[in-house]
Regions:
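Conserved catalytic core of the tyrosine transesterase superfamily
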Residues: 1-275
Length: 275
């Protein structure tokens, strides 16, 4: 749903820019000028790449639907620069929860529980909003989650997350179908979660957000497996994250290996020089 909204917004903006132009004026040069203007808006390279990809899909649909030649084959989508997610240190994790858990109000405990579930169970933002009370199994420490396409999966519930949930349930004045609610008792929305995440991000000296919390879960899941078992189960992680394609999950294998190698690196020079 969010992806469709984003797609519509991008193409609505593009369409409003070229409505006054005749079809004959919509050339490769026109596209280049428009795409360059995106950089003038101070958008990141990754965002511009997303804009161009969505616009190209829209134009290809117009070509087929209205039998037009909009030269879409000449539109080159730039590759998004790949950036490894920041893996939080123990100190940074303490900073995050110290900011959220300023008091023992039910709203503070709610926010702690949401962040904890993203960080320790790998929930997406929308999955946290849609989590039902009946799908939380405290005794077995399991959550039933409905992900993209309403696909059901089970994810682990850590001790800290369980404690936050128990304290939140005990203090929340509302007892509803969904686990997390707003001040008025209604189901919490993605915008509400995004708002408090943005407020937190503004107070932290490092990158923070729901996607980064999920990335941290995935990377640390593999690192912990390696430290405990000497191997990493990519398919177990795929199941927990709700991915359909193992290639999506494999990026975390690469990141986890980087972290493991960097922390266990044996310096040849140190050995020679006696350090």
């Amino acid at each position: 749903e969010q992806s469709l909204t984003h797609y519509s917004e991008i193409n609505r903006s593009f369409a409003s820019d070229c409505l006054s132009e005749p079809v004959s004026a919509i050339t490769v040069e026109y596209y280049q000028t428009y795409f360059l203007s995106l950089y003038d808006r101070h958008l990141s390279k990754a965002t511009v790449s997303t804009y161009i990809r969505h616009i190209k899909i829209f134009l290809k649909w117009l070509e087929v639907e209205y039998n037009l030649d909009l030269q879409t084959k000449k539109i080159k989508v730039p590759k998004s620069p790949k950036k490894n997610p920041h893996i939080y240190t123990n100190t940074e994790l303490q900073q995050i929860f110290a900011l959220i858990h300023k008091d023992d109000s039910w709203l503070s405990l709610r926010n702690c529980a949401i962040v904890s579930l993203m960080l320790d169970s790998g929930l997406r933002q929308n999955e946290a909003c849609l989590l039902k009370t009946c799908d939380v199994d405290m005794s077995r420490q399991i959550l039933k989650v409905f992900g993209k396409g309403e696909k059901e999966r089970f994810v682990p519930l850590g001790n800290m997350s369980r404690q936050f949930l128990q304290e939140y349930f005990a203090k929340c004045p509302y007892h509803k179908k969904y686990v997390f609610c707003s001040k008025d008792g209604s189901q919490i929305t993605r915008n509400a979660v995004k708002l408090f995440m943005n407020k937190l991000a503004a107070q932290l000296p490092f990158e923070f957000g729901s996607h980064r919390l999920r990335h941290n879960f995935a990377t640390n899941f593999l690192i912990d497996q390696y430290n405990e078992k000497g191997s990493m189960d990519i398919y177990a992680l795929l199941t927990i994250l709700g991915h359909e394609d193992v290639k999506t999950t494999e990026r975390y294998l690469h990141i986890a290996n980087q972290v493991i190698y960097s922390t266990s690196h044996i310096s040849h020079l140190d050995k020679i020089m006696g350090f």
